[in-house]
Design a protein with these regions (language model features):
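Conserved P-loop NTPase "ATPase switch" module shared by AAA+ and STAND
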Residues: 108-132
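C-terminal alpha-helical "lid" subdomain
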Residues: 2-7, 17, 29, 54-56, ...
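Conserved AAA+ ATPase "SRH/arginine-finger" region at the nucleotide-binding site
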Residues: 71-74, 161-163, 174-187
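Walker A/P-loop nucleotide-binding motif
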Residues: 36-57
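A short hydrophobic beta-strand->loop->alpha-helix junction that borders the nucleotide-binding pocket
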Residues: 46-47, 68-77, 154-155
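Sensor-1/coupling segment of RecA-like P-loop NTPase cores
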Residues: 40-47, 99-102, 128-129, 142-167, ...
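Conserved NTP-binding/hydrolysis module of P-loop NTPases
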Residues: 8-16, 66-68, 76-95
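Pre-Walker A adenine-sensing motif
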Residues: 23-34
């Protein structure tokens, strides 16, 4: 609907078309460097701070030379995670854990001989049992040094790793980063960059609308995107091609945008 109304060739704010902010691009570059030396990287942030954006950028970075098998379903036993990894590596999973481990290591060696790098991604790693993470780390210890195990999680993972009992895991982390919430100016720049991507003028959103979106999103990149898209839908309903306070405020009146104390009034 938005694409047709605004005469666009591609959808605005689409995840596959997001341009990284400078801070995100720096993180992506660092992750790639660690793929060349056998890394264990931890990417942590509150929901909506851009973890998924960086994950997708890593997956899209160089699909031919940098393979990124991904585990998104982390509420599993260690053996279940092994099976998911085998599927991601295009390996027929065997029933026994040690056979799955051996198959994964053999496949990693094969990929290394092809001159390719590996960046296995464990998403929502804070939901995994620490013992499962520990056993996974031991498996990747036997991988050739062409890999980087990337753990993407909420901040509670850092709390787990800070415990003395988990020092064996923490001491092997080669890079960690805590994603910060966006400053208002960064949120506005994100919107303007996305408009550039789809060849829409910066005046599509008025300055007041941009400022309100930046404040209301509370620094969460996902909220910036969702609020901007919803405001564009309201503009379609109003048959206007300029998003102003009227459209943004109408979105903010929806229950899921209002705080509990507001809903009780």
């Amino acid at each position: 609907m938005i694409r047709t109304y605004f005469g666009l060739e591609q959808d605005p704010f689409h995840p596959s078309n997001v341009e990284l902010l400078p801070s995100q691009d720096e993180i992506l570059s660092t992750l790639r460097v660690h793929c060349q030396q056998g890394g264990l990287c931890v990417l942590v942030g509150e929901p909506g701070t851009g973890k998924s954006v960086i994950k997708q950028a890593l997956k899209d970075l160089d699909p031919k030379m940098l393979l990124t098998p991904t585990v998104n379903r982390t509420l599993h036993t260690y053996h279940s995670v092994l099976r998911i990894l085998c599927e991601a590596f295009n390996i027929e999973p065997d029933g026994l854990a040690h056979k799955c481990e051996s198959a994964l290591i053999a496949q990693a060696d094969k990929i290394n001989k092809q001159g390719k790098m590996l960046a296995p991604i464990i998403d929502d790693a804070h939901l995994m049992e620490v013992d499962a993470l520990r056993r996974l780390r031991l498996v990747f210890e036997d991988f050739p040094k062409n890999h980087n195990l990337v753990l993407i999680a909420q901040p509670e993972l850092l709390s787990k790793l800070s415990l003395a009992v988990n020092d064996d895991l923490r001491s092997r982390v080669t890079y960690s980063v805590l994603l910060q919430k966006l400053a208002p100016d960064d949120a506005i720049q994100f919107i303007l960059r996305q408009l550039d991507k789809v060849a829409l003028g910066h005046n599509t959103f008025t300055d007041d609308a941009l400022s309100l979106i930046a404040r209301s999103s509370e620094g969460a990149l996902r909220k910036v995107r969702n609020l901007a898209l919803a405001a564009m839908l309201e503009a379609v309903r109003d048959r206007t091609k300029t998003i102003d306070l009227k459209q943004v405020n109408r979105v903010l009146m929806q229950p899921h945008w209002r705080r509990e104390r507001d809903l009780g009034d």
